[in-house]
Amino acid sequence: MATSSTQLLLSSSSLFHSQITKKPFLLPATKIGVWRPKKSLSLSCRPSASVSAASSAVDVNESVTSEKPTKTLPFRIGHGFDLHRLEPGYPLIIGGIVIPHDRGCEAHSDGDVLLHCVVDAILGALGLPDIGQIFPDSDPKWKGAASSVFIKEAVRLMDEAGYEIGNLDATLILQRPKISPHKETIRSNLSKLLGADPSVVNLKAKTHEKVDSLGENRSIAAHTVILLMKK
């Protein structure tokens, strides 16, 4: 009985082996395809609406300059920079004070480099257009204008937006003349123009070690950093 069972198993094994050799055992055929979207995808990115260059340009007018910052923050920081060429025949005015010198700033207005960069610092903190856009040199009404006019407008915009000066730090860069004898007068006048306590207005002066136009007494520059606080 055992021999008969063994023969049956061997016979079955041989039959199975011959079937594999002659005709491989295959799984039911299944179609495997690559997924493709019904519609072709475009790799180009198209905005929902076309925006022309003109629409992104800032149209500087009263409605723009009087607009309050869209986001109310407890503090706002601004930076201003300005540079003017020094030429004979012009007065040198810094912070609204006439400084004795053999040359002054060649500019469309009175060329007060300090007040100009302070204005830009305030406007920058408020997120508004710069001084050149609000008071363009292409407008004849600003020719020879006192820069105190620009400061007053910047202060008005700051007040309208609900901010006041936390502190201001300015640096003058010029080779000549020496600013130290005039520094306190300039700082005091700047504080008055800003309506700020003198303790929050700081002024420094640096030479340019006789390097480039600043060091050669051919130009004057100024930097200002300002912190505005919500009233």
Curated annotation (Swiss-Prot):
InterPro entries: MECDP_synthase, MECDP_synthase_CS, MECDP_synthase_sf. Its cofactor is a divalent metal cation. A divalent metal cation binds at residues 82, 84, 116. One of its GO terms (cellular component) is chloroplast stroma. It holds the Pfam family YgbB. Keywords: Chloroplast, Isoprene biosynthesis, Lyase, Metal-binding, Plastid, Transit peptide. The record marks 108, 207 as: Transition state stabilizer. PROSITE patterns: ISPF. It catalyses: 4-CDP-2-C-methyl-D-erythritol 2-phosphate = 2-C-methyl-D-erythritol 2,4-cyclic diphosphate + CMP. One of its GO terms (molecular function) is 2-C-methyl-D-erythritol 2,4-cyclodiphosphate synthase activity. Pathway: Isoprenoid biosynthesis; isopentenyl diphosphate biosynthesis via DXP pathway; isopentenyl diphosphate from 1-deoxy-D-xylulose 5-phosphate: step 4/6. Signal peptide: none annotated. Residues 1-52 form a transit peptide. Binds 1 divalent metal cation per subunit. One of its GO terms (biological process) is isopentenyl diphosphate biosynthetic process, methylerythritol 4-phosphate pathway. Disruption phenotype: Albino phenotype and seedling lethal when homozygous. The phenotype is caused by an early arrest in chloroplast differentiation. Induction: Circadian-regulated with a peak in the late period of dark phase and early period of the light phase. PANTHER family: 2-C-METHYL-D-ERYTHRITOL 2,4-CYCLODIPHOSPHATE SYNTHASE, CHLOROPLASTIC. Belongs to the IspF family. NCBIfam families: ispF. Enzyme of the plastid non-mevalonate pathway for isoprenoid biosynthesis that converts 4-diphosphocytidyl-2C-methyl-D-erythritol 2-phosphate into 2C-methyl-D-erythritol 2,4-cyclodiphosphate and CMP. Is essential for chloroplast development. This is 2-C-methyl-D-erythritol 2,4-cyclodiphosphate synthase, chloroplastic.
